[in-house]
């Protein structure tokens, strides 16, 4: 694939760095490379880490209440209160009309489930809680999967385990000067080993200064394809698999 317009530009008046050399090398070979504004500064990364830490705390607060009998609205209430207590803004609230602060997806719902008083968690349900928030205009995005009551069917237990393994394997593939396709390839290979399908309509994405940024991180694909990964890029890996 050849891109007529160059995406990478060296800083005027500055020496060419190893990063410049690597990116220009791959761009000259016809690979898709990031633009310079996709590379976060150390200060920006520090702010994103703070947002990520607050987001982790929010999911920890959710973990403390997950049990049979609560509603997904109860989860939303906890997330809203946690954001208020920690000077954070729930990014999902009113995003493209989404009415709640968090996504709660039960069993066959892949993602973006809307919390409701009527949606009561039952023993053996699997529920994904997907939270994005901002702190001082920096964004953190993460989700966590729960088995309600701690026990479910062997089929659901394996699905949850393999999904987590896909995340870990995808993260291991995210190395400097590799490609987004390397991540997707690793995830797809592991999921298909257990005869699961990878959801293709949704993907990970860049994050940090906004809720959704470049690049799109597909959870399937081929090695050596997609955008070049370089130090300073920040993105989510959120594999979704199904039986």
Summary of predicted features, one role per range:
Residues 1-243:
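Active-site neighborhoods and metal-handling regions in enzymes and metal-associated proteins
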